[in-house]
């Protein structure tokens, strides 16, 4: 158990979304037997010593903290900033970490990239491919035969119907409904679309 204890986990981003991800991360680690003091916030902006019971570290402090391994989930809404942070973490040997709420529904043949965040009440139906560092915020769903790129953000309540391709860095706003595509002729949401 000691090597397990010595790994350090971070929610990168201590603003509103990060504070929503932290309890999910805490619960996920508790189920894996990881002590809550091995979970921290990391933020580049100065702030209080603790937020909602977890220590707040700068990125430099996170790297300096003794740990067998470091893992970070990127709770930053901007896909562009997430991509830069993902590159920085990789260069510094910080592992991408995904966080999934306990009540997420995941059906058949769902492939997830690294670093994905799935908030409470997210549903992923069947035959779906999702790229790296995707954010699925509360009450969003992704229906059958969808392909979602890297660094895509779904705000709360996004309804992504069947046969849709969402390209890298797209940001889909709260309550958006993406109408269904046709088999063999998917609806495409372009790269970087907002």
Feature roles, as predicted:
Residues 4-79:
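A solvent-exposed beta-alpha-beta segment
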Residues 27-28, 89-92, 134, 152:
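Glycine-rich, phosphate-binding/catalytic loops in enzymes
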Residues 57-111, 115-123:
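Compact structured core domains
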Residues 99-194:
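Structural signal for interior beta-strand "rungs" in well-ordered beta-sheet cores
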């Amino acid at each position: 158990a000691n090597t397990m204890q010595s790994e350090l986990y971070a929610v990168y981003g201590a603003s509103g979304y990060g504070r929503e991800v932290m309890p999910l991360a805490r619960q996920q680690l508790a189920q894996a037997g990881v002590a809550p003091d091995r979970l921290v916030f990391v933020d580049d902006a100065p702030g209080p010593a603790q937020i909602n019971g977890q220590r707040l570290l700068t990125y430099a402090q996170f790297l300096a903290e003794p740990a067998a391994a470091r893992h970070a989930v990127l709770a930053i809404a901007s896909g562009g900033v997430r991509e830069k942070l993902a590159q920085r973490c990789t260069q510094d040997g910080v592992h991408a970490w995904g966080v999934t709420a306990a009540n997420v529904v995941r059906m058949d043949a769902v492939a997830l990239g690294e670093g994905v965040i799935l908030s409470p009440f997210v549903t992923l139906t069947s035959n779906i491919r999702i790229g790296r560092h995707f954010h699925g915020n509360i009450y969003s769903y992704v229906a059958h035969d969808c392909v979602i790129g890297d660094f895509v953000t779904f705000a709360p309540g996004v309804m992504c119907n069947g046969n849709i391709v969402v390209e890298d860095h797209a940001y889909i706003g709260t309550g958006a409904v993406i109408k269904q595509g046709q088999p063999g002729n998917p609806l495409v949401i372009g790269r970087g679309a907002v």
